[in-house]
């Protein structure tokens, strides 16, 4: 069963943490950070596809953090101010994550951090901000993408504070990664994922629509036009870079650039065959879960 706990930041913002724990006290905890569009529960705790539940079943506590503006965390006032700056930039979220990690460190001896997509930027920044970590996993990282891909991220010269994504848009995006979606994704996977997402971020039923803050897109655009927003050369903890072989968002070339820039003596790069950017909710998810758990077992 999942549980929720909250952490308050210095400015009073409430950050939600979704937790699954093993039956016995756990010395190790794994902390997950979601990507730019979908919050913690759809990314890591979709019923029947839960990476949190898998982690807890292996004896580690599992926590997934909702960044500000996502899921059950506080909604920034800037999201509803057309003249406001797009909220939820990685730099701010990394500071919030540090507060979360410091809180969890009181309950566990070892913390393992897992970033996903845009969440790898947050995780990369957090690694250099003082909290002691036992390892880092950068899953489906967007690190130093080809500048030719900037149109996939750029919210424009006068970006709105938030964006909307419909159910149809979300399914089309996922389908675009897969040669034949039914060969790679269970029949009920999308519906379960969308229901979990809409429960946390839904704003309209006709058509079914969710919202996300646009600060994340500014981070991705900056990485594509200016280079990485965090210093991989400052990351010294054991690190695994892992992606699905079909991922069109987190490319092989970009993942290898991150791997090559890491300062960690213990660094690995891995690919999971026949998985997309949504690998954690696809049929090959167990291969991902096993690979990450094996990496954690060594630390």
Task: Go through each PLM region and give its residues.
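Conserved alpha/beta-hydrolase
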Residues: 47-76
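Conserved hydrolase catalytic core segment
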Residues: 108-147
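Conserved alpha/beta-hydrolase "acid-adjacent" motif
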Residues: 248-254
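N-terminal cap/lid segment of alpha/beta-hydrolase-fold proteins
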Residues: 1-23
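The serine-hydrolase catalytic nucleophile loop
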Residues: 37-51, 253
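Catalytic histidine-centered segment of alpha/beta-hydrolase-like enzymes
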Residues: 275-286
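Alpha/beta-hydrolase
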Residues: 153-230, 234-240
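Alpha/beta-hydrolase active-site loop
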Residues: 84-105
